């Protein structure tokens, strides 16, 4: 890296060092009611189905997309 490039980069990032970073005031507490095994299983199953079912459908019909009509 040339001297000019390093000076230019230092000049561009120098002013950003003094900007205040906003901090989120988020405080968390333990849940009032623990999730049961069945609720966790239903949640994970619905996440997997919603992600993998459309992807599987597209992959299984990939040849249909390749055919010229």
Curated annotation (Swiss-Prot):
Protein modification: In response to mitochondrial stress, the precursor protein is ubiquitinated by the SIFI complex in the cytoplasm before mitochondrial import, leading to its degradation. Within the SIFI complex, UBR4 initiates ubiquitin chain that are further elongated or branched by KCMF1.
Keyword vocabulary terms for this entry: Membrane, Mitochondrion, Mitochondrion inner membrane, Transit peptide, Transmembrane, Transmembrane helix, Ubl conjugation
Short motif SIFI-degron, span: 2-19
Keyword Membrane carried by entry: yes
UniProt pathway annotation: Energy metabolism; oxidative phosphorylation
Predominant localisation class: mitochondrion
Coiled-coil segments: none
Mitochondrial matrix side: 26-36
The protein, known as: Cytochrome c oxidase subunit 8A, mitochondrial
Keyword Transmembrane: yes
Positions in the Mitochondrial intermembrane compartment: 61-69
Organism for this UniProt entry: Macaca silenus
Lineage, broadest ranks: Eukaryota, Metazoa, Chordata, Craniata, Vertebrata
Transmembrane segments: 37-60
Any one GO cellular component localisation term in the record: respiratory chain complex IV
Family to which this protein belongs: Belongs to the cytochrome c oxidase VIII family.
PANTHER family the record matches: CYTOCHROME C OXIDASE POLYPEPTIDE VIII, CYTOCHROME C OXIDASE SUBUNIT 8A, MITOCHONDRIAL
InterPro entries: Cyt_c_oxidase_su8, Cyt_c_oxidase_su8_sf
Transit peptide, residues from-to: 1-25
Membrane topology per record: Single-pass membrane protein
Subcellular localization(s) per the UniProt record: Mitochondrion inner membrane
Record's function text: Component of the cytochrome c oxidase, the last enzyme in the mitochondrial electron transport chain which drives oxidative phosphorylation. The respiratory chain contains 3 multisubunit complexes succinate dehydrogenase (complex II, CII), ubiquinol-cytochrome c oxidoreductase (cytochrome b-c1 complex, complex III, CIII) and cytochrome c oxidase (complex IV, CIV), that cooperate to transfer electrons derived from NADH and succinate to molecular oxygen, creating an electrochemical gradient over the inner membrane that drives transmembrane transport and the ATP synthase.
Oligomeric and partner information: Component of the cytochrome c oxidase (complex IV, CIV), a multisubunit enzyme composed of 14 subunits. The complex is composed of a catalytic core of 3 subunits MT-CO1, MT-CO2 and MT-CO3, encoded in the mitochondrial DNA, and 11 supernumerary subunits COX4I, COX5A, COX5B, COX6A, COX6B, COX6C, COX7A, COX7B, COX7C, COX8 and NDUFA4, which are encoded in the nuclear genome.
Gene Ontology terms describing biological process: mitochondrial electron transport, cytochrome c to oxygen
């Amino acid at each position: 890296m040339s001297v000019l490039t390093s000076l230019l980069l230092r000049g561009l990032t120098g002013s950003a060092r003094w900007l205040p970073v906003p901090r989120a005031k988020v405080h968390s507490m333990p849940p009032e009611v623990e999730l049961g095994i069945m609720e966790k299983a239903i949640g994970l199953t619905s996440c997997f189905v919603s992600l993998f079912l459309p992807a599987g459908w597209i992959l299984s019909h990939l040849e249909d997309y390749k055919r010229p009509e």
